[in-house]
Amino acid sequence: MNLELGAGRKLLVKERLEVPGNQIPLLLDNYIDFFTLLSGERQGDYDRFKKNMQLRLNALSIGDRSSPWYNYAQGEINLQGALIKAKFQDYWSAAWEIKHASFFLQDNFKKFPDFLPDNNGRGLLIALFGSFPPGLKTAVGFLGMEANTTEGIQLMETTMKRLQSGKYAYLYDESALYLSFIQSSITDSPDNYNRCIERCKQIDSQSLLKAYVIGYVALRTGHSDVAISVLNARPVGPQYVPFAQLDYLSGIAHLNRMDSDASTYFYKFLTENQGISFIKDSYLRIAYSAYLVHNEIAYRGNLKKVISEGFAYSEKDKQALREANAGIAAEPLLRARLSYDGGYYDKALAYLTAINIESLHEERAKLEYLYRLGRIYEALNKTADAMHYYLLAGNHGQNSPYYFAANAALHLAMIYEAQHDFSHARNFYRLCLDMKEEEYKSGIDNQARDGLKRMK
């Protein structure tokens, strides 16, 4: 998990020479390719990965069927293949990899119910399905698979705790990092940060993947100062796989703080990045930086690059393109949004309370104002105020294409659920699902469906 992939390759060469009949290096070779693509997203690496993955599966298929490692190794390779193929928009092929992974891991569970390594992959499959992009969700849906985020995360959490000791303890780091990343990506809970920090305490400080996951989770949960500290202190050296996305995360953290050097991190990412994700979003955030210092030329120029450069594959890049076409929000709203994202809630509230809502003429701006006040008050544990503004956002934006009303309904439902008012919670989860927002719909709807499942 340190992402010292060159050293890993050398160890696998040594293992093959010393134990030529051992098939586990086939799985570990796939890990190396998997992490290379997660950090780099290069098309040439992807083409090689698909070819090599199939060769590895062919070799594993003639192994010892009486061993739990027979199904496990094939299931893990299929699962890694599914995640990478989904990243490259190869949805139908990814769907078949998911089907094969599910078969191998479930079959193994039936034959070897005490084989703990299976549970990470099984939990991951169950949790992730609902958060798949629409194209992949459609493809997998034809294969008859269903999701349950809560059930999947619970299985991963139970597995991680059991991996803290015993003969499979070497899998703890992987389990803790995957769980922290997945939980933060598909559930919206302030507890995700503390959970991540606690899980990762025992992981080697020289793990580049650890730095990435903690930085990512810190950003997702409003801890930009922590993200900056962790990413600045990350291990460096030629032994590590190139990971340009770490500079992208640093840029977001610095922009949330409205630091004057935020753009330098995005430019570094754009220079070193060879992948397909976050190019549009980087140019949008460079435009934000210019906008905040009233550099009209740089602002307009980078908005044009949002439209002309990169790909609209990831949700962040799709949203960046929408915003570039619509125009950036009024400056106080943008400052409030960035401050909120960074965890600077009092500062965010000050920006918003200085705004007269009547001065906001566009529907999107008014909805964001109401919604953002709800989010800030919820973060400040002022629940009644949060619910008031969530209701206003929901009522004003119920037929809007923007995500504010739907996410407001989702948060109202979660508040009612926490208060054990399940009748109101169900109503707002259903209202959330009925809305026709065009932004972040898959992720919002998945959380609403999962909320309804919890109350059955």
Report residues per predicted region.
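TPR/TPR-like alpha-solenoid signature
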Residues: 27, 34, 72, 79, ...
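Alpha-helical repeat scaffolds
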Residues: 10-14, 46-61, 92-106, 144-160, ...
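Short coil/linker segments at helix-helix boundaries
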Residues: 3-11, 29-181, 185-195, 199
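Solenoid-like repeat scaffolds
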Residues: 13-21, 64-65, 111, 141-146, ...
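C-terminal soluble interaction/assembly domains
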Residues: 363-456
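Residue-level recognition of tetratricopeptide repeat
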Residues: 31, 38, 76, 83, ...
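Residue-level detector of the short coil/turn that links helix A to helix B
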Residues: 3, 89, 147, 187-188, ...
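Generic helix N-cap/helix-start motif at coil->alpha-helix transitions
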Residues: 67, 115-116, 134, 168-177, ...
